[in-house]
From Swiss-Prot:
Highest classification ranks of the organism: Bacteria, Bacillati, Cyanobacteriota, Cyanophyceae, Nostocales
The protein's assembly and partners: Homodimer.
Record-annotated Biotinyl-binding domain positions: 104-180
Top-rank taxon, per record: Bacteria
Keyword Cell membrane in annotation: no
InterPro entries, alphabetized: ACC_Biotin_Carrier (IPR053217), AcCoA_biotinCC (IPR001249), Biotin_BS (IPR001882), Biotin_lipoyl (IPR000089), Single_hybrid_motif (IPR011053)
Protein name from the UniProt record: Biotin carboxyl carrier protein of acetyl-CoA carboxylase
Origin species: Nostoc sp. (strain PCC 7120 / SAG 25.82 / UTEX 2576)
Renumbered residue ranges of the record's region Disordered: 70-95
Length: 182
């Protein structure tokens, strides 16, 4: 029995509000896997295997098994502080250019999805480390629900570091790259 859009949306909302890092739904006709980025080491710990109806509610078929994994609490790297977690963003609580210190800004993911450095496989990447970029320039793509969303730089400057590998899943507001503003 295929899921409709509202059932998938309800499932994604439920997952986003928990510490579940990965969910896989399987039936005869399809398989759906949802993963969240879970920190520096990207390890997950299995927690529960239960029928789907016990996790989400009565809107989904109960014959589909669900496997859930808890996301570990991210621990800071030795010698670093969590100050970047409390940095002020340039547009309130919206993702975008986050000033991580007086010299660097971060481009953050505005959504959960998959990070891509190029517009298509085999094509040139949008930016490389060391490139000079301008405000509004496309720096990457985040694929979310089969839609390609171009992510633009909120500041002009030089790309100092790209924090995510091509094809990796990203979380909402996850830093993607660091820029030294002009």
């Amino acid at each position: 029995m295929p899921l409709d859009f509202n059932e998938i949306r309800q499932l994604l909302t439920t997952i986003a509000q928990t510490d579940i890092a990965e969910v896989t739904l399987k039936s005869d006709d399809f398989e759906l896997t949802v993963r969240k980025a879970v920190g520096v080491n990207n390890s997950v710990v299995p927690v529960v295997t239960a029928p789907l109806s016990g996790v989400v509610g009565s809107g989904l078929p109960s014959a589909i098994p669900i496997v859930a994994h808890a996301a570990p609490s991210p621990s800071p790297e030795p010698g670093t502080s969590r100050a970047a977690d409390h940095a002020v963003t340039s547009s309130g609580s919206q993702p975008g250019a986050k000033i991580i210190d007086q010299k660097l800004a971060e481009v953050a993911s505005p959504m959960v999805g998959t990070f891509y450095r190029a517009p298509a496989p085999g094509e040139a990447v949008f930016v490389e480390v060391g490139d000079r970029i301008r405000q509004g320039q496309t720096v990457c793509i985040i694929e979310a629900m089969k839609l390609m969303n171009e992510i633009e730089a909120d500041v002009s400057g030089q790309v100092i570091e790209i924090l995510v590998q091509n094809g990796e899943p990203v979380e909402y507001n996850q830093p993607l790259m660091r820029i030294k503003p002009d």
